[in-house]
Design a protein with these regions (language model features):
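N-terminal helix-turn-helix DNA-binding core of bacterial DNA-binding proteins
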Residues: 2-41, 63-77, 81
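Alpha-helical residues within the helix-turn-helix
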Residues: 36, 47, 53-54
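Recognition helix of helix-turn-helix DNA-binding domains
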Residues: 44
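C-terminal structural segments of small proteins and small subunits
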Residues: 72-100
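Hydrophobic alpha-helical bundle segments that form small-molecule/ligand-binding pockets
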Residues: 103
Length: 103
């Protein structure tokens, strides 16, 4: 497996999924603006954004005195590649099983 584990771990949390979906759908935002939109504190949002950043799911950019976060779905490519490979392996196994049962 590629290093998709941090992505899976980051997206396992519903708050982080909501943050990633928000940034993906509506574009960049600061932790302060996200705190006004979501029912959690700015400090909690900052911690969640740090996990998403470590997983490569968001990018940080200074915007004056604030840090702006934007979705960076590149890390999802590794996960997609891994899932496609695992899916193909299972399709092959199930095909062999189907042929064995039919024979």
């Amino acid at each position: 497996m590629t290093d998709a584990q941090p992505v899976f771990a980051a997206l396992a949390d519903p708050t982080r999924r909501a943050l990633f979906e928000r940034l993906s759908a509506q574009g960049p935002a600061s932790a302060s603006s996200l705190a006004r939109e979501l029912p959690i504190t700015r400090q909690a949002i900052s911690k969640h954004l740090a996990v998403l950043d470590d997983a490569g799911l968001v990018e940080r950019r200074s915007a004056g005195r604030e840090v702006e976060y934007r979705a960076s779905p590149r890390a999802l490519g590794e996960v997609t590649t891994w899932m496609e490979r695992v899916g193909a392996d299972w399709e092959e196994r199930l095909g062999k099983l189907r042929r064995a049962v039919e024979d």
